[in-house]
Curated annotation (Swiss-Prot):
Required for the formation of a threonylcarbamoyl group on adenosine at position 37 (t(6)A37) in tRNAs that read codons beginning with adenine. Is involved in the transfer of the threonylcarbamoyl moiety of threonylcarbamoyl-AMP (TC-AMP) to the N6 group of A37, together with TsaE and TsaB. TsaD likely plays a direct catalytic role in this reaction. It holds the Pfam family TsaD. It is found in: Cytoplasm. This is tRNA N6-adenosine threonylcarbamoyltransferase. It comes from Mycoplasma capricolum subsp. capricolum (strain California kid / ATCC 27343 / NCTC 10154). GO terms for cellular component: cytoplasm.
């Protein structure tokens, strides 16, 4: 069973081909350099660049897999969430291929894809407790199968990735700022700057707007007083505050839902502190099937969509 998957929800256009649960190729066309000058992703530019890039990405994926397009059995693509223009390009490419080779097409969820991207090299044992962290999402999910996802907590305002990027921008760091803050934090003192501790209420929801505002106000106040900001210490203080609440909420979820697998997914799953938290909690609560995704599967890629499609088709064929 060969599946060709397309991921185009933001500023990456990616095509992956999977053959019976083995990833044959995962080609990614990244636009980071094109958007850096603007300090963030420009939706119209992202969609136009997808149009320019999809042809060579498709050719490269087929060439690397040593396959002809007619040998593909299923087409899968990201339907949502994401930038509308970018999603439409991926959908059009997927539908065109599907019509051309007369093969079934699957429209899949981007976040569910991220979750199953974590299982590419480590198979899930259900139930799965997944921490989803990205530019647009901060949520905890319980997964019982490729068709059974339960969101038990989500962001009420800003997502953690958005908070990272906005704080980095105010500090004068380049885009994307999250990875830069993470690297700086490794060398800093988390107790150097005083930031408000995020509230741990009785829910599994998250809120990062208060932390974002507090950071921006502190930076502006220090600048007005002409006090030098130690970037490493600021990053460490910010990162500790941003991730500490994740550890608390996850620990509570582990006690309540008793998962057999613990993992993390989404672009911010590349964050060093969050990865440490996942592994630490897995060890503390003896969840033997605890793992973090390979770094190349953290950011947007089509391999995660291919894996989700494979698991959904497998489940359907068993029924």
């Amino acid at each position: 069973m060969k599946i060709l998957a397309i991921e185009s929800s933001c500023d990456e256009f990616s095509i992956s081909i999977i053959d019976n649960n083995k990833i044959l190729t995962n080609i990614i066309s990244s636009q980071i350099k094109d958007h850096q000058v603007f300090g963030g992703v420009v939706p119209e530019l992202a969609a136009r660049l997808h149009v320019q890039n999809f042809n060579w990405v498709l050719k490269a994926a087929l060439s690397q897999s040593n396959l002809n397009i007619e040998e593909i059995d299923y087409i899968a693509y990201t339907k949502s969430p994401g930038l509308i223009g970018s999603l439409i390009i991926g959908k059009l490419v997927a539908e065109t291929i599907s019509l051309y080779i007369n093969k079934p097409i699957l429209a899949l969820d981007h976040i569910q894809g991220h979750i199953f991207g974590a299982s590419i090299e480590n198979e899930f044992i259900y139930p799965v407790l997944a921490m989803v962290v990205s530019g647009g999402h901060t949520q905890i999910e319980i997964i019982n199968s490729a068709n059974d996802f339960q969101i038990i907590g989500s962001t009420r305002d800003d997502a953690i990735g958005e908070c990272y990027d906005k704080v980095a921008r105010v500090l004068g760091l380049s885009y994307p700022g999250g990875p830069i803050l993470d690297k700086l934090a490794l060398k800093g003192n988390k107790d150097f700057y005083s930031l408000p501790v995020l509230k741990d209420d009785n829910t599994y929801d998250f809120s990062y707007s208060g932390l974002k505002t507090a950071c921006i106000n502190l930076i502006h106040n220090l600048n007005q007083k002409k006090q030098e900001i130690n970037l490493e210490n600021f990053a460490a203080s910010f990162q500790y505050t941003a991730t500490n609440i994740i550890e608390k909420k996850l620990e509570k979820a582990i006690k309540e839902f008793k998962p057999k697998t613990l993992t993390v997914a989404g672009g911010v799953s590349a964050n060093s502190e969050i990865r440490k938290i996942i592994l630490k909690l897995g060890q503390k609560y003896n969840i033997k099937n605890t793992f973090v995704p390979k770094m190349s599967y953290c950011t947007d890629n089509a391999a995660m969509i291919a894996k989700l499609a494979y698991e959904k088709i497998l489940l359907k064929n068993k029924l």
